[in-house]
């Protein structure tokens, strides 16, 4: 039994609606919030910036205005505001628009598709601004890795019937564009979580840290910056290594690199191996193999640090596990399941660390 509320028909309809999720993703992909960041635009002007059809974009915007992500004014409101001299939303000092050309809140859905009224960025739409703190735009971009994940769910029926998708979507199989988008998303997360990881345990006890599957090196940059005496090596696919070397140079840190497929490489010896959001990408046999390769390369008294999300929030845990299913590889695991996988690789858990941001850290030793 559970004390969670039982969804009614209206709740189910809202939960199953695909219009809002797709409309938001199209807005993110077309960068509509960024195009409106400097002030209101007509549908024609916005369409020109977004490389979209003005009439179709106007209809999309009318929906997003009704949902509160953007603001609008009709042609009639434009004339009324121009006559009265009263500014609308976004028309104050520094807004970069002429008097009388602002956007009124009273006409949220007042723009006819293809009309000459203006659209402006609403408060809710600011989460779609690229680069803004907490921005979701890159995750929602249908042309990036976020879109790759989203589209995979349209194959959920076949996946559930067959036990897995027709084609796996791990990083090795991604297109260069999708793989680059994935690296960028993971780097943003690593930069945000890196300081907390550097503080949660004493990295000065290590001489050499190897980050296995560390993307473009954002996590290693955080560690090597906080602990200058630490030596680091990044193990990644060759395309990611190229970007990582540029990032290391820009950050002014010295870091070794080893490019190739983890399962085909001989890992360098080190006293700490870091696997961040990596094992959940593997089924159990591959996870055991990855951990065993790290164990064999450990210096005496070394450890393997597994960074994976906690299963403390069931809804989030279940969502991520379903995502791994439709992507065709890996699974989320409970603490006990990670311990079992580690044991099969000849490792046992020594400690758990809980950073103030990011995944928990599981320390495994021989």
Where are these regions (language model features)?
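Conserved Class I S-adenosyl-L-methionine-dependent methyltransferase catalytic core
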Residues: 14-27, 34-35, 49, 55-80, ...
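Alpha-helical subdomain
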Residues: 1-81, 203, 208, 212-366
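Intrinsically disordered, low-complexity terminal tails and inter-domain linkers enriched
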Residues: 73-116
């Amino acid at each position: 039994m559970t004390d969670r509320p039982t969804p009614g028909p209206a709740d189910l309809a809202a939960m199953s609606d695909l219009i809002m999720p797709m409309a938001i993703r199209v807005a993110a992909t077309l960068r509509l919030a960024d195009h409106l960041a400097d002030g209101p635009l007509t549908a024609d002007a916005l369409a020109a910036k977004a490389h979209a059809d003005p009439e179709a974009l106007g209809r999309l915007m009318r929906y997003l205005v009704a949902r509160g992500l953007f603001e609008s004014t009709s042609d009639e409101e434009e004339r009324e505001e121009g006559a009265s001299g009263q500014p609308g939303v976004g028309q104050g000092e520094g807004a970069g628009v002429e008097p009388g050309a602002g956007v009124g809140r009273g006409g949220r859905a007042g723009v006819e598709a293809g009309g000459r009224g203006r659209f402006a960025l609403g408060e809710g739409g600011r989460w779609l601004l690229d680069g803004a703190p907490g921005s979701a735009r890159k995750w929602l971009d249908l042309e990036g890795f976020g879109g790759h994940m989203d589209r995979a769910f349209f194959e959920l029926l076949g996946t559930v019937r067959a036990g897995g998708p027709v084609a796996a979507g791990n990083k090795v199989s991604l297109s260069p564009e999708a793989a680059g988008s994935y690296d960028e998303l993971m780097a943003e997360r690593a930069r945000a979580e890196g300081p907390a990881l550097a503080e949660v345990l004493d990295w000065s006890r290590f001489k050499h840290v190897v980050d296995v599957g560390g993307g473009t090196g954002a996590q290693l940059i955080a560690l090597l910056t906080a602990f200058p005496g630490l030596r680091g090596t990044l193990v990644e696919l060759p395309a990611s290594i190229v970007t990582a070397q540029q990032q290391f140079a820009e950050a002014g840190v010295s870091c070794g690199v080893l490019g190739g497929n983890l399962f085909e490489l001989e890992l360098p010896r080190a006293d700490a191996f870091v696997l961040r959001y990596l094992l959940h990408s593997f089924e159990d046999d591959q996870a055991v193999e990855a951990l065993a390769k790290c164990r064999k390369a450990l210096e005496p008294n070394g450890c393997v640090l597994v960074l994976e999300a906690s299963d403390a929030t069931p809804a989030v845990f279940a969502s991520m596990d379903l995502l791994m299913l439709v992507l065709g590889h890996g699974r989320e695991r409970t603490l006990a399941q990670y311990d079992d996988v580690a044991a099969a690789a000849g490792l046992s858990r020594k400690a758990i660390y809980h950073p103030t941001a990011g995944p928990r850290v599981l320390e495994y030793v021989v």
